[in-house]
A protein has these predicted regions:
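Conserved N-terminal subdomain of the carbohydrate kinase-like
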Residues: 1-58, 83
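Structured loop/turn residues at beta-strand edges in well-structured enzyme cores
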Residues: 49, 109, 140
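Conserved beta-alpha-beta core of the PfkB/ribokinase-like small-molecule kinase fold
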Residues: 53-136, 152-153
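Conserved phosphate-binding/catalytic region of the ribokinase-like
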Residues: 76, 126-212
Length: 212
C-alpha cells in the first residue's frame, strides 16, 4: 500500500442493480472523480519495481485522460512483464462502438493475455464469431484469449488450439466479480507456471479452477 495516493476528488461510484437471475447492470458516476483524472507521476516506475504481471482493464482503459496516461505507462511496463487486459465493456458510459473498439484494439496489441466475455465480444464485434476475433488477436501477438460465457463455461484459445471447460451449476445470488475471479486465477497461473505453459492440459486445469 505504500504506492497508494490521496486525492481531493471523490472516487468513482458504480451503482449495481440485479435482475431476478442475479445478472448485474451498472450506473456510473465518473464526472469530476479522481479515478479518471490523475498524473503520470502517480504511477510506479516499472524499471524500479520489476513487476511480474500487469492486469488492467474496464473503464480506465477507455475514458480520457486516464486511458492515455495509463497506456503510455503500460508500454513501459510491457518491457518487463506480460500484460493481462480485460475490456469489461461498459457501453452505458461510452456507447460509441467505433471509439470503444479502437480503444480495445490498442490495448489488445500491447497485451499477452486478453480475458473477455462473450457479451463483450458480441457488442464490440457484431456478426463475428468469438473464434474469429480471438484468432485475429492471436495473429497480432496475443498469447492467450480467455472467453467467459456465464453458465456455458470458459474457452481458452492459443496458437495451439482451443480448450473448453463447462460451467458449474450453482444457485446464483449475483454475478458481480465473477469475471474478475477468472482473471485473478489466470494471473496466478501466469506467475506460478509462466505464460507459455498455459496450453493443453495445463490450461484446461486452470480454466476448470476458474469455472468452479
Amino acid at each position: 500500500l505504500d504506492l497508494a495516493l490521496v486525492s481531493d476528488k471523490p472516487t468513482c461510484l458504480a451503482i449495481v442493480s440485479l435482475d431476478e437471475k442475479g445478472g448485474a447492470s451498472y450506473e456510473f458516476k465518473i464526472e469530476g472523480t479522481a479515478t479518471f483524472d490523475f498524473s503520470s507521476s502517480w504511477l510506479p516506475d516499472p524499471s524500479r519495481y520489476k513487476p511480474q504481471v500487469l492486469h488492467i482493464g474496464t473503464l480506465v482503459t477507455v475514458i480520457e485522460p486516464a486511458c492515455d496516461v495509463l497506456y503510455d505507462w503500460a508500454m513501459q511496463v510491457a518491457e518487463f512483464a506480460p500484460i493481462v487486459f480485460d475490456p469489461n465493456v461498459r457501453s452505458v458510459v461510452l456507447n460509441d462502438r467505433d471509439r470503444y473498439v479502437a480503444a480495445v484494439e490498442r490495448w489488445v496489441a500491447l497485451s499477452s493475455v486478453v480475458k473477455v466475455s462473450d457479451d463483450d465480444l458480441a457488442w464490440l464485434y457484431p456478426g463475428e464469431s468469438y473464434s474469429e476475433v480471438a484468432q485475429r488477436w492471436i495473429a497480432g501477438g496475443v498469447t492467450l484469449v480467455v472467453i467467459t460465457r456465464g453458465a456455458a463455461g470458459l474457452i481458452g484459445i492459443t496458437a495451439e488450439g482451443a480448450v473448453e471447460v463447462p460451467g458449474v451449476k450453482v444457485d446464483v445470488v449475483d454475478t458481480v466479480g465473477a469475471g474478475d475471479t477468472v482473471g485473478a486465477i489466470v494471473v496466478e497461473a501466469m506467475v506460478e507456471k509462466g505464460i507459455l505453459a498455459l496450453t493443453g492440459d495445463t490450461l484446461k486445469e486452470v480454466l476448470h479452477r476458474a469455472a468452479v
